[in-house]
Amino acid sequence: MSIEEIPQGADVSILSKNEKKARELIKKLNLKQIKGITRVTFKQRGNLIYAIDQPDVFRSSAGTYVVFGEAKVDDMNKRIAEAQQQQAQQDALSKAAGETGEAGEEDKSQDAITADLEKASLNTNKIEEEEADDGEVDESGLDAKDIDIIVEQTQVSRAKAVKALRVHDGDMVNAIMELS
């Protein structure tokens, strides 16, 4: 069959001479062809992806795979940038729609959720610090060097360090473990 005889729009793949030889050798190795695979991707450093659409995949008895097809390079950084741009456009459209009278919908974007979580964690941290730093703490019976070491290691207030030392009867290791 020549190229002129192939009907227009037919799904025909033309194999190179080297690929034909490789396929013949694969048949001699008794590899099993795996049907139903539509895409194979290979990931490399820097979010670089090699993608093969509609591949011919063969599996050996040892569990290795041989993949035939046209490899295309996908740059994940570019895809991520495009996705972020689309997300920004959708956010702008939803804000514009919200201003026209569709109020009541909550913002469920990733940035909004992250901001809400950070705000909540900052509020709880402030409350805890206010409770702990109510005034001077009685350090009698404890070594000042131990308190300084705990404050330095765990980055907590002096009052919390004293409280942890008192709970653990002056044991620095357990106090540090509790605070970190």
From Swiss-Prot:
It comes from the Eukaryota. It is found in: Cytoplasm; Nucleus. GO terms for cellular component: nascent polypeptide-associated complex; nucleus. Residues 142-179 form the UBA domain. One of its GO terms (biological process) is protein transport. InterPro entries: EGD2/NACA0like, NAC-like_UBA, NAC_A/B_dom_sf, Nas_poly-pep-assoc_cplx_dom. Residues 81-113 are annotated as: Disordered. PROSITE patterns: NAC_AB (PS51151). The keyword Nucleus applies. Pfam families: NAC, UBA_HYPK. Coiled coil: none annotated. The keyword Transport applies. Residues 16-80 form the NAC-A/B domain. One of its GO terms (molecular function) is phosphatidylinositol-4-phosphate binding. Residues 82-100 have a biased composition (Low complexity). Keywords: Cytoplasm, Nucleus, Protein transport, Transport. Belongs to the NAC-alpha family. Part of the nascent polypeptide-associated complex (NAC), consisting of EGD2 and EGD1. NAC associates with ribosomes via EGD1. Component of the nascent polypeptide-associated complex (NAC), a dynamic component of the ribosomal exit tunnel, protecting the emerging polypeptides from interaction with other cytoplasmic proteins to ensure appropriate nascent protein targeting. The NAC complex also promotes mitochondrial protein import by enhancing productive ribosome interactions with the outer mitochondrial membrane and blocks the inappropriate interaction of ribosomes translating non-secretory nascent polypeptides with translocation sites in the membrane of the endoplasmic reticulum. This is Nascent polypeptide-associated complex subunit alpha. It comes from Debaryomyces hansenii (strain ATCC 36239 / CBS 767 / BCRC 21394 / JCM 1990 / NBRC 0083 / IGC 2968) (Yeast). The gene is EGD2.
